[in-house]
């Protein structure tokens, strides 16, 4: 039995490295059912679960990672808390996202300025944006920009510029589109961690969709596709790719309704539990396609 577990762990880790999310997730799930995974394996398991569209399970696993990190590294625990807040926010749970942001803040109080403070500032900014709190959004955005400059951190600089661009577009300033173009095209800079880069893309695409800026939806969806190809080479299916495809299809007007239904139905499972906005768009696309097919 020990040999079987060892072999399954090897399969899970190897599959993850080659971006075979399904095999990795299923193998980790089998091992997790019979033995305790170490913290690094748990984190990878959570990531594979998210990419397979299992958002609720991914959050549950990452909460275990957070609990373990509390005992060993408060700064890493704070970073994990911020990631959890971002995940809950993507899934449409603003109150829980705020709760995790506050946990992260408590862990970072008194800690010398580090990148984790910047990611937390981003989380506070986007939760404020989703809550319609302009004052807190502005404060958190300025804080992020200051930390990015102080640390000379390229990833945080990209996040700060993305927030500035989305804020400008939302306020009706067309210069915001140019700022976002500079951040996102041809592709978002590689130093930005996957979870945070994905949030930038989903926010920019959702904003362009709300503004009926179909040219930007197409351009930024192409950028996200290139980003997926760079971060998930050889992977043909993942939640991130599905979110990208949902936005891409939302800007297509000449697709056969029946073909569109087939494509959207295949995407529904992957986005339903990881991105509330994309999940809503899936239902809109299905409703529109069914109506056109009649």
Sequence positions of predicted segments:
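Compact, aliphatic and Gly/Pro-tolerant "microcore" segments centered on a short helix or tight beta-hairpin
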Residues: 99-189
């Amino acid at each position: 039995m020990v040999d079987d577990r060892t072999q399954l762990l090897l399969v899970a880790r190897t599959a993850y490295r080659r971006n075979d999310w399904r095999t990795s997730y299923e193998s980790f799930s089998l091992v997790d059912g019979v033995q305790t995974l170490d913290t690094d394996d748990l984190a990878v398991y959570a990531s594979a679960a998210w990419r397979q569209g299992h958002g609720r399970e991914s959050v549950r696993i990452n909460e275990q990672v957070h609990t373990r990190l509390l005992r060993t590294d408060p700064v890493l625990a704070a970073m994990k808390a911020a990631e959890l807040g971002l995940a809950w926010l993507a899934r449409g749970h603003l109150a829980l996202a705020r709760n995790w942001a506050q946990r992260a803040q408590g862990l970072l109080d008194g800690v010398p300025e580090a990148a984790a403070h910047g990611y937390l500032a981003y989380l506070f900014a986007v939760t404020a944006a989703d809550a319609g709190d302009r004052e807190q959004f502005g404060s958190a955005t300025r804080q992020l920009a200051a930390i990015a400059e102080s640390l000379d951190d390229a990833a945080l600089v990209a996040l700060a510029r993305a927030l500035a661009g989305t804020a400008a577009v939302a306020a009706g300033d067309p210069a915001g589109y140019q700022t976002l173009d500079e951040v996102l095209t041809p592709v978002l800079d590689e130093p930005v961690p996957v979870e945070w880069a994905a949030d930038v893309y989903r926010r920019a695409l959702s904003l362009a969709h709300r503004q009926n800026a179909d040219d930007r939806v197409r351009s930024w969806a192409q950028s996200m596709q290139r980003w997926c190809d760079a971060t998930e080479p050889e992977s043909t299916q993942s939640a991130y790719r599905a979110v990208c495809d949902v936005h891409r299809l939302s800007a297509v007007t000449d697709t056969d309704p029946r073909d569109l239904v087939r494509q959207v139905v295949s995407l529904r499972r992957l986005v339903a539990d990881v991105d509330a906005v994309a999940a809503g768009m899936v239902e809109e696309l299905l409703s529109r396609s069914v109506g056109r097919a009649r």
